[in-house]
């Protein structure tokens, strides 16, 4: 079977399989999607996956090819209210299982963790989602915590949290624990400041994995305040650390270790307060110069023989891949243009967009690009890739069509390019200003 057609059939086969146990994905299994309607279970899933940034009426007109008997926008909203967000999380997860292969870096799989805000229209009945967009406006927000494969360029897992109840550290721990890896597979988690808690580090170490996390540089408050640093601006040192809850029981302390008491107010999943158990953690702290007199500190448990400071700097720089993926997800996949106000609708669309992002990435990786004489490597323009993949999912097109279409939109990859990060005003695109 043709490669692209097989990827498409694998993607839609998930929905076919879901139809054998529909009650698992609906609000009321005794009532919902029991009758045969135009907007049945399969159609609702497919249409939600293919939503773009237009109005619901325009989306319906596109999906049903301007059929005069197509359902109304009201009917669509009523039907989607019967679906659980878990239905789209299931599609996202199952497609990841189908295409789980990922390139490695020196035999290590690189996973980046980061978070992003998804803004939608305010609702006074959803106080846990309220946040301030600016000094004059209040909006609702869901915090998207994502685990991203930097070399495979796919989202591996996601946790959605209300803005006011968000905990990036707890979400990170959940994604670490849920990660299924093959036997003897080596994984490096790469994260930015905000993920430097001891609890997360121990979760990673318990699974025999590795971490590389940027932390607050001394002398600022942070995880490094317990350590004594060398006088040099750049260094690479190992600090044997013992975590403990105890502050009163007599212990025979070792002068070669640093003892850090974990307050009972802090969550620590692997330490029983009653038994007063300790936990040993060896941290490697590396301080590097990134240019213009600016230094950054990294903590890791990677061996220095295989990963000197220069390698760690290169690895951490690769973390930027998750930042560019958020840009593509929000502005190309159109994650910012939601089609509802209810938090359940927003969660549906977030998981649906993540699934479509991964589908486009798998298609992109299957394309063989050959340039006889070229200074740069080339890749497909992501904006045109998304547009083409959506048409490919909706229409009956063959492999030759998608291959020739995408070959027209190749861009050179120029490594090492840098731009100042711009502060962009965050807002919501009103329903009144959509086509």
Language model features by range: what are they?
Residues 1-56, 62, 76-83, 107, ...:
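Single, function-defining residue in the core of a domain
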Residues 61-68:
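The alpha-helix within a helix-turn-helix
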Residues 130-137:
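An active-site-proximal beta-strand-loop segment
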């Amino acid at each position: 079977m043709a490669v692209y057609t097989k990827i498409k059939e694998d993607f839609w086969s998930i929905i076919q399989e879901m139809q054998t146990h529909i009650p698992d994905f609906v609000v009321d299994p005794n009532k919902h999607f029991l009758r045969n309607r135009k907007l049945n279970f399969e159609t609702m899933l497919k249409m939600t996956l293919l939503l773009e940034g237009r109005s619901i009426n325009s989306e319906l007109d596109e999906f049903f090819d301007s059929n005069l008997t197509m359902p109304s926008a009201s009917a669509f909203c009523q039907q989607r209210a019967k679906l659980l967000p878990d239905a789209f999380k299931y599609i996202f997860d199952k497609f990841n299982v189908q295409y789980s292969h990922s390139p490695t870096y020196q035999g290590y799989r690189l996973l980046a963790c980061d978070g992003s805000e998804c803004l939608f229209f305010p609702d006074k009945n959803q106080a846990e989602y309220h946040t301030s967009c600016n000094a004059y406006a209040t909006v609702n927000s869901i915090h998207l915590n994502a685990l991203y494969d930097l070399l495979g360029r796919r989202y591996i897992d996601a946790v959605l949290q209300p803005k006011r109840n968000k905990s990036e550290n707890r979400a990170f721990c959940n994604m670490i624990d849920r990660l299924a890896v093959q036997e003897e597979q080596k994984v490096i988690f790469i994260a930015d400041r905000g993920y430097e808690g001891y609890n997360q580090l121990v979760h990673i170490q318990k699974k025999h994995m590795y971490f590389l996390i940027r932390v607050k540089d001394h002398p600022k408050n942070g995880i490094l305040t317990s350590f004594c640093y060398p006088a040099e601006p750049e260094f690479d040192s190992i600090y044997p650390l013992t975590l403990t809850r105890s502050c009163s029981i007599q212990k025979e302390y070792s002068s070669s270790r640093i003892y850090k008491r974990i307050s009972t107010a802090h969550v620590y999943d692997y330490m029983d307060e009653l038994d007063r158990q300790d936990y040993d953690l060896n941290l490697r702290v590396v301080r590097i110069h990134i240019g213009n007199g600016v230094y950054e500190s990294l903590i890791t448990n990677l061996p220095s023989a295989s990963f000197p400071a220069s390698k760690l700097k290169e690895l951490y720089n690769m973390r930027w891949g998750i930042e560019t993926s958020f840009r593509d997800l929000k502005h190309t996949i159109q994650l910012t243009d939601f089609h509802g106000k209810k938090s359940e609708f927003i969660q549906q669309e977030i998981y649906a967009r993540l699934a479509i992002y991964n589908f486009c990435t798998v298609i992109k990786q299957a394309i063989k690009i050959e340039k006889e004489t070229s200074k740069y490597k080339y890749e497909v323009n992501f904006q045109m890739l998304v547009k083409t993949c959506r048409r490919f999912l909706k229409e009956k097109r063959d492999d030759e069509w998608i291959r020739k279409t995408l070959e027209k939109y190749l861009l050179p990859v120029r490594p090492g390019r840098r731009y100042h990060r711009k502060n962009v005003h965050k807002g919501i695109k009103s329903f009144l200003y959509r086509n």
